[in-house]
Every structure is written in C-alpha cells, then in structure tokens.
C-alpha cells in the first residue's frame, strides 16, 4: 500500500496567488504544502508592475524587491499624441517576477509552509471528503485544495470550475539600458497602434520591459507591432525570442463549487480586461482563499458561500466594471482616449490609483478623489504634446 503524506491544504502553483495564500495559511499554523512544476527561481513572463492597490496588499515590506518606482505615467495615441501625467504619489512599483516570486515563496516557507518545486502534478481526485494528489514522484492527500496553477492548470482542467472562454494575450521582451540612461524612459502606454490593446514600456533598474497587449485572442501579428515599436524606440532586445502569456478575464463568471477546491489568480481567471493587471487580483484572491479556508478548518465546514460572497464583492464586481469600461474604451478610439485624457478623468484616475482603489471603489469614493483634486493635494499635472 502506497503511503501518502497528508496536509490540511495543498496549493498547486507558487506564483503570487499561491505563495501569498500559503504564507497566510502558514501564519495561522495550518499545515500547508505548495507544489510547483518549475524549479525556483524561474523566469515568468510578466510586465512586473505593482499598482498601489497591489503593493499595499502585502503585510510585509517588499521594498528590497522593487527595481523602480514612479509617480508619473505617459500615455499616447498611435505614438503621436502624448500626455505626461504626474503627481506627488507613487502609482506603480516595478519588480522582476523571477526574483519577486522566489521572495514570496520564501516568505511562506519561513512562516511554516512546505514547498516542493520541480515537481509536476499529474492527477488529482476527490473522494471520501479528501483530495488525492499524484505527482511524477510522490502522492499527497489534503482536505482543502487551492488551484494557483495558471490559465491552463491541472486543477481547473480536472474539476471544470470556470470556463476558460474570455482572455487576451500579451508578448514582451526586456531591452538592456544603462543605469545612466534608464531615467530617459517613462512608464508608457500607447493606445491605438495595437488593435484592442496597447504597447507598453516599463522601466526597471538596468533594462526596460517593452510589450504589447491585446484583448483580441485571435490576433496573429501582435509580435510585429512590438518589434516595430522597439525599433522606433531605438532599443535592442536582450534576445530574439519574445515571451508570451495569456491574460484571463473569465473570472467574472467564477462560481465556487460545493467541494473545497478554490481557484485563485490566473487559474480563477482574475485578470483585468482594460489594463491587463493581474498581480493585485492574484494576491487578493490568495488572501481571501486563505482566510475562508482557515475559518472553515476551525469550524469543520467549508463555507462556500462566504468565499463566493467575498470574491463577488472584493474582486468580481470590480473586474466586471473594468471589462465593460475596457470594451467601451477600445471600441471607441480615439474619442475614448481624448475623453479619458481630459483633466477631470485623469485627476480622478490618478487619485484613485494612488490610493489603491479598485474600479468599483473609484466610483463609490469619487467624492474623495474630487475633493483631493479640487484642493490639488497630489499636485497633478497633465502635459500634452505631439511628436
């Protein structure tokens, strides 16, 4: 008879969602195992921008992992009409996912979690109120399972919790830049060039991450848009191979099943349609999953309704609003760009973003943003120019 070590919770995937859930559970003295098929540290394609709502989500300092911070943003339409929007509050902190993810899983391990990397899960079954997990080398059992294994993860493929029918796509490449010249590059979003999406520049410490994002998953030539943009910028990619990844939106339809298997982050489809942001929703969903599971372990009953309520209130509601705003924005360029880049919307968005508000919170607390804007507390400027 094969012996299987049992844990209270097993988490498949050690990205921000899985690692932070493990950290929260381990802090609560819950016996948790994290399994990832890759050996850490590992490369992870991601622009690596932490918005204020993302970097405010951690209950430990992350300053040592930050490559670059900015209180300004440049937006453009077809790389011609530019708006340089700045103020006195931090909007985004840049990280490198390879290092950041390794940092997060180490925080979980330091708190008491067990981590097995370089181990692939090959089969999962749910029987007699527990999960059996088969890997390429071992077997494990648990009462609660968290799927943090991305858009094509085995957890959702096994249990079909949410249909993977809404998603976009992004490609990126790092371009080396000397420390002396990194200040010449701003965090930039160019709309109108890539259909239903944007081009981006995210400065780090000794390189810039340049990428292209589209909400149209069927687009075939997104790589060409990116390479043309890099050439116009006068940059040289660090390699010839572009890295691509899916941006999921299908989490707006997430419904938690009765049995205690919870999806988090990209596995749950928690990505933002308009901006493509994902790290905040990864950490937020990991936090919610950990808190509900901790409470459920104490009570002895999985509280599915509590998890669904919190997902709905704290994640899905904002994602749905971002989805419809994004649909309007990309479907009505350049009118929508000019509208959004006018003084009042820019000011409200700056105040909301710097306060770490989600889309739905931005609307419910618009009076706070307006008050700060009228008093010019953030010293916001919106300089328009042409190239």
Curated annotation (Swiss-Prot):
State the source organism's domain of life: Archaea
List, in alphabetical order, the Gene Ontology terms for molecular function in this entry. Answer: FAD binding; oxidoreductase activity, acting on the CH-CH group of donors, NAD or NADP as acceptor
Q: Note the InterPro entries from the entry.
A: FAD-bd, FAD/NAD-bd_sf, Geranylgeranyl_Rdtase_fam, Geranylgeranyl_reductase, GGR_cat
* Pfam families listed in its UniProt record: FAD_binding_3, GGR_cat
PANTHER family with a match to the protein in the record: CONDITIONED MEDIUM FACTOR RECEPTOR 1, GERANYLGERANYL DIPHOSPHATE REDUCTASE
NCBIfam families reported in the protein's UniProt record: GG-red-SF
The record's family statement is: Belongs to the geranylgeranyl reductase family. ChlP subfamily.
The protein's name: Uncharacterized protein Mbar_A1602
What organism does this protein naturally occur in? Methanosarcina barkeri (strain Fusaro / DSM 804)
């Amino acid at each position: 008879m094969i012996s299987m070590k049992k844990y209270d919770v097993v988490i498949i995937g050690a990205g921000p969602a899985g690692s932070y859930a493990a950290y929260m559970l381990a802090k609560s003295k819950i016996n948790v195992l994290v399994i990832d098929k890759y050996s850490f540290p590992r490369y992870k394609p991601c622009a690596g921008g932490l918005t204020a709502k993302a970097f405010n989500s951690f209950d430990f300092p992350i300053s040592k992992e930050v490559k670059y911070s900015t209180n300004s943003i440049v937006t453009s339409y077809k790389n011609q009409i530019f708006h340089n929007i700045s103020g006195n509050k931090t909007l985004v902190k840049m990280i490198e996912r390879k290092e950041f993810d390794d940092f997060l899983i180490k925080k979980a391990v330091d708190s008491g979690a067990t981590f097995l990397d370089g181990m692939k899960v090959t089969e999962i079954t749910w029987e007699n109120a527990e999960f059996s997990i088969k890997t390429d080398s071992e077997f494990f059992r648990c009462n609660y399972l968290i799927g943090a294994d991305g858009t094509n993860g085995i957890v959702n493929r096994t249990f079909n919790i949410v249909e993977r029918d809404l998603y976009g796509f992004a490609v990126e490449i790092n371009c080396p830049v000397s420390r002396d010249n990194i200040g010449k590059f701003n965090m930039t979003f160019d709309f109108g060039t890539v259909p239903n999406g944007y081009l981006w520049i995210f400065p780090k410490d000794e390189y810039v991450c340049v990428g292209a994002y589209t909400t149209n998953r069927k687009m075939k030539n997104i790589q060409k848009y990116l390479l043309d943009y890099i050439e116009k910028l006068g940059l040289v990619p660090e390699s010839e191979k572009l890295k691509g990844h899916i941006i999921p939106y299908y989490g707006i339809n997430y419904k938690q099943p009765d049995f205690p298997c919870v999806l988090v982050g990209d596995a749950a489809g928690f990505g933002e349609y308009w901006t493509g942001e994902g790290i905040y929703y990864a950490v937020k969903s990991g936090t919610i999953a950990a808190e509900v599971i901790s409470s459920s372990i104490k009570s002895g009953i999985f509280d599915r309704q509590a998890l669904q309520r919190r997902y709905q209130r704290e994640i899905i509601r904002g994602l749905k609003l971002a989805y419809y705003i994004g649909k309007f924005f990309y479907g009505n360029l350049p009118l929508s760009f000019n509208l959004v880049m006018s003084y009042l919307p820019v000011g409200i968005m700056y105040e909301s973003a710097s306060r770490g508000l989600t889309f739905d919170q931005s609307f419910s607390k618009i009076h706070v943003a307006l008050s700060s804007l009228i008093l010019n507390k953030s010293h916001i400027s919106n300089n328009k120019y042409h190239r």
